[in-house]
UniProtKB/Swiss-Prot annotation:
Lineage of the organism: Eukaryota, Sar, Stramenopiles, Ochrophyta, Bacillariophyta
Subunit structure: PSII is composed of 1 copy each of membrane proteins PsbA, PsbB, PsbC, PsbD, PsbE, PsbF, PsbH, PsbI, PsbJ, PsbK, PsbL, PsbM, PsbT, PsbY, PsbZ, Psb30/Ycf12, at least 3 peripheral proteins of the oxygen-evolving complex and a large number of cofactors. It forms dimeric complexes.
Subcellular location: Plastid, Chloroplast thylakoid membrane
Name of the molecule in the record: Photosystem II extrinsic protein V
Residues annotated for heme binding in this entry: 47
GO CC aspect terms: chloroplast thylakoid membrane; photosystem II
Main location: plastid
Example of a GO biological process term: photosynthesis
Organism: Thalassiosira weissflogii (Marine diatom)
Membrane topology: Peripheral membrane protein
Matching Pfam families: Cytochrom_C550
Cofactor note: Binds 1 heme group covalently per subunit.
Presence of keyword Secreted: no
Cofactor(s) the record lists: heme
Amino acid sequence: ALSLATPRRDNINALVDYLKNPTSYDGLDSIAEIHPSIKSADIYPRMRSLTDDDLYAIAGHIMLQPKVVSEKWGGGKIYF
């Protein structure tokens, strides 16, 4: 699913870009006001203190987790 987004979000650099400036799946609209991001740190205070290293770690986690807990990843609260 991440590879079908525009722009593709199936690599760490693309996910870091998304964490800084999130857009809709088609890439046309900014969703920063409704999604935590560096761009919306005034709305989401926890984003204020994140460094680029933190963002790369988060993106790496997102890329790795489906391989670790494949059926649970992205399944929401039903698995917990």
